[in-house]
């Protein structure tokens, strides 16, 4: 409750003031308030339940039990991400009857209000579902939409999405384990666990600076998959530009700024990367932002307090990606 209250002015800035300043479509204020309250209540309930489970495991088994509980809760979050997005963000999903590849993952269309919603890949490995924003179907050409679907299917087939997921699980689980043994932290009392969660939040900020580079390699790998499967550089560039205009609208940025804060590289860098004949680096698709969502299991407070989703409940569970 204290954290939610502290975040109110920042949520107003990120969810209302800045989007309207840059002429982004936003719901009316009463609807925004109701959606924010619903999202805060659901996220708070998830965080509380997660920490309670970790506390019970810590009191019963010890630090190893608490770490195992954190890992299992994260796996549960991955499995239920779609449903949490529906409950928290208020989006609705419609499964597509005719997928572009019968042997590929299921594809669902998301009906949403936030212009920054990009959809993602949800579900456990082997049971993935590609979520596509409804706005893309009305504002992108069929060729651009097909290119983007092929990219996301490529993230699955190359293993990049699974690698990103495993990295996020490893980072959060390992970080929590370290934080739980720091001074005044622990897993057997509420004050100890609260201290561990605070340590974890500070550590998460450091990961925000380190993980984007690995995530960018996943973007490059998905672009390469689309190129190798018949989509030209021009098509991939046009698709990336269209998505950029719909969401971040930041086509040019310094390399230093991008290297720290942006897990999705700018279009210019993506096109330059495609000029390479082969790629030897395997990426971890969406690892940086998946780490934020999965931090719910560890009491992480940064999951809804980063520049891409602050004050925007539709983006708290499915954070923006490429």
Task: Annotate the PLM regions.
Residues 1-188, 210-297, 301-303, 309-322:
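Polar-ligand-bearing catalytic/cofactor-coordination segments
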Residues 188-197:
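Loop-to-helix entry region at the N-terminal start of transmembrane alpha-helices
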Residues 197, 201-213:
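Hydrophobic alpha-helical transmembrane segments of polytopic membrane proteins
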């Amino acid at each position: 409750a204290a954290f939610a209250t502290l975040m109110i002015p920042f949520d107003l800035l990120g969810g209302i003031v800045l989007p309207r300043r840059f002429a982004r479509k936003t719901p009316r204020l009463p609807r925004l308030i109701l959606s924010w309250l619903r999202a805060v209540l659901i996220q708070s309930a998830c965080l509380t339940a997660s920490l309670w489970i970790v506390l019970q495991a810590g009191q019963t088994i010890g630090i190893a039990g608490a770490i195992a509980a954190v890992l299992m809760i994260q796996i549960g979050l991955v499995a239920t991400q779609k449903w949490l997005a529906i409950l928290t963000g208020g989006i609705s999903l419609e499964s597509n009857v005719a997928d572009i590849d019968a042997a590929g993952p299921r594809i669902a269309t998301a009906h949403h209000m936030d212009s920054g919603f990009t959809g993602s890949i949800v579900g456990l490995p082997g049971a993935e579902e590609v979520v596509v924003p409804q706005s893309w179907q009305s504002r992108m050409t069929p060729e651009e939409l097909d290119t983007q679907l092929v990219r996301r299917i490529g993230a699955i087939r190359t293993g990049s999405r699974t690698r990103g997921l495993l990295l996020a699980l490893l980072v959060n689980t390992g970080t929590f384990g370290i934080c739980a043994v720091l001074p005044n932290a622990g897993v057997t009392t509420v004050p100890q666990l609260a201290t561990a969660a605070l340590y974890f939040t500070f550590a998460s900020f450091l990961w925000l600076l380190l993980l984007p580079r690995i995530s960018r390699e996943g973007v490059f790998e998905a672009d390469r998959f689309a190129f190798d499967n018949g989509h030209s550089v021009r098509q991939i560039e046009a698709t990336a530009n269209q998505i950029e205009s719909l969401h971040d609208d930041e086509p040019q940025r310094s390399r230093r700024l991008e290297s720290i804060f942006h897990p999705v590289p700018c279009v210019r860098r993506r096109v330059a990367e495609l000029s390479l004949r082969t790629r030897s680096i395997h990426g971890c698709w969406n690892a940086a932002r998946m780490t934020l969502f999965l931090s719910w299991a560890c009491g992480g407070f940064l999951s809804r307090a980063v520049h891409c989703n602050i004050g925007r409940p539709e983006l708290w569970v499915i954070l923006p990606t490429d």
